[in-house]
Amino acid sequence: VIGSPVGAYFVSGVKPLRLLVERKQARTAPGGTGEAKCGGNYAASLHSQIEAKARGCNEVLFVDAVEHRWIEELGGMNFMAVSRDGQLVTPELTGTILRGVTRKSILEVAPDLGLEPVERKIGIDELLDGVRSGEFPEVFACGTAAVVTPIGSFLDGDTEVKVCEPTGKTTMEI
């Protein structure tokens, strides 16, 4: 066991993230190590991370490697969305998404916060349309280092989609 002091995962603290939507480059593929915590998974996301930084984004939201339409996760964090009707929606585990401890914990406490946890496929277009319409007023990333970090906007190509409540009540409670 090695212990060392660390700072915040994001230097800016808990401020809403701006995400680059990555529709082409995959973080991992079926049959690989996507659900494991291993260096190769992070290395595969570096090219997209460099592009995200160059475009003024904090992180990358990856979709699946096969159809390029189903949300998977960020470079090193799981993804969750709060729906207008009280669901806490997160991509179902498919073998390409990290079985995050923080993700699991949030899903377990969701009912105590009045949320219905739902694990299912989430299409990237469904998400972006839902953010625009207010169906998903809050979205956030979560992970051991990143804890719960609100998402403020998505950059999809040249289109910016802003979240209605980037530091919403539910996200901050979680």
Residue ranges of predicted features:
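Helix-start/capping segments and mature chain N-termini
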Residues: 2-174
